[in-house]
């Protein structure tokens, strides 16, 4: 029989083993222009880098979420069972997403726990996730700037291990560089459907145009969209649907800006 906290220690040890492997990943040290080449795409794509980022973030923010669970009044036995469950990863990912969107997760998570009716709940993680989604849907988040890497990857924040923070920063830089490089490539070559809607504009590579195109390029690279449709099919998965809506908003902005440009109005 394991003593209290041993389940959590085992989870942390396993996570650190995974992180060690990720940190040895040589492809992460490649520069943006090198990662654009086809033979390096498997390791340097936003799909791969975002997956690494999320794995590191889950471990890096672990203590933060534990603190909020305790603040809400959950006892250690319940917390141990929660973090050992399969749904804990989904919950922590949702907390990071809401935090990056500007919601006050530090205040809201303890509040939804204190709302009660948690006794004998079979799936506490899913219930807390549902409550967080419900309460955050009722109001607009903080006016502070949303913290999204390349417009689609929620940024991890809060106090964390310095080594993990450095690993996150490195991957944030790589994701951003790749997304921007892909956006420039698309705008320069007109190789994607997203690029074609803005190429007629003289300002296609400046300001908001590049930012919006970067979001679309990041989405395509993360989810392997290669067809003529800028965003591909509407996804069924909840997590991808969130990213799809972000990319769709950027695409709409691109088209609206193009339609309003002098070049678009010219006969």
Task: Label each PLM-derived region with a short phrase.
Residues 3-267:
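Alpha-helical structural signal
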């Amino acid at each position: 029989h394991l003593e209290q906290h041993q389940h959590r220690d085992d989870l942390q040890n396993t996570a650190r083993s995974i992180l060690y492997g990720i940190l040895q990943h040589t492809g992460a040290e490649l520069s943006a222009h090198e990662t654009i080449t086809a033979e390096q795409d498997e390791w340097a794509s936003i799909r791969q880098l975002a997956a690494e980022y999320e794995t590191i973030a889950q471990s890096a923010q672990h203590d933060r979420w534990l603190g909020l669970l305790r603040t809400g009044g959950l006892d250690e036995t319940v917390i141990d069972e929660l973090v050992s469950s399969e749904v804990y990863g989904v919950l922590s990912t949702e907390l990071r997403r809401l935090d990056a969107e500007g919601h006050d997760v530090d205040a809201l998570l303890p509040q939804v726990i204190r709302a009660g009716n948690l006794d004998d709940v079979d799936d506490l993680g899913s219930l807390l996730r549902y409550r967080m989604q419900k309460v955050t849907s009722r109001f607009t988040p903080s006016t502070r700037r949303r913290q999204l890497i390349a417009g689609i990857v929620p940024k991890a924040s809060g106090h964390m291990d310095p080594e993990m923070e450095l690993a996150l920063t490195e991957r944030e830089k790589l994701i951003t560089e790749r997304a921007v490089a892909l956006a420039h490539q698309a705008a320069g070559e007109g190789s994607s459907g997203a690029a074609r809607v803005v190429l007629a504009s003289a300002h296609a590579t400046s300001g908001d145009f590049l930012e919006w195109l970067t979001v679309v390029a990041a989405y395509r690279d993360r989810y392997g969209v290669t067809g003529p449709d800028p965003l591909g099919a509407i996804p069924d998965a909840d997590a991808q649907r969130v990213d799809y809506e972000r990319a769709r908003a950027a695409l709409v902005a691109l088209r609206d800006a193009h339609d309003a440009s002098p070049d678009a109005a010219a006969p």
